[in-house]
């Protein structure tokens, strides 16, 4: 199943098959793809929260790059641990995106 996930780019997509989700640059382990405007950040927020986080928690996430603490994760792990996913609303999500460099320094994230 192809899932259109605009945000990082307008044509971003993820591939969901069986118990696997290939996320490209949309979702990484503990991180997400970058955006360059509020509008794109909102699209990304909707893609992540309404589309990807609605998948079963045991779904294995295979990002396009290994930028996290592990090369793979699960939807459940991302719901519990990804700082972007656990934000309570879009404004908090956007604040984190705009202050990601400082957040990484404060939390020892590379």
Listing of model-derived features with the role each one plays in the protein:
Residues 1-58, 62-63, 92:
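Catalytic core of the metallo-beta-lactamase
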Residues 43-110:
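Accessory terminal helices/loops
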């Amino acid at each position: 199943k192809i899932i259109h996930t605009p945000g990082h780019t307008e044509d971003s997509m993820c591939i969901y098959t069986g118990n696997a989700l290939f996320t490209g640059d949309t979702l990484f382990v503990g991180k997400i793809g970058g955006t360059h405007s509020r509008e794109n950040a909102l699209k990304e927020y909707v893609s992540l929260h309404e589309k990807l986080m609605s998948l079963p928690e045991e779904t294995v996430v295979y990002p396009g790059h290994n930028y996290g603490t592990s090369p793979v994760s699960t939807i459940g792990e991302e719901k519990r641990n990804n700082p972007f996913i656990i934000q309570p609303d879009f404004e908090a999500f956007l604040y984190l995106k705009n202050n990601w460099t400082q957040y990484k320094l404060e939390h020892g994230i590379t």
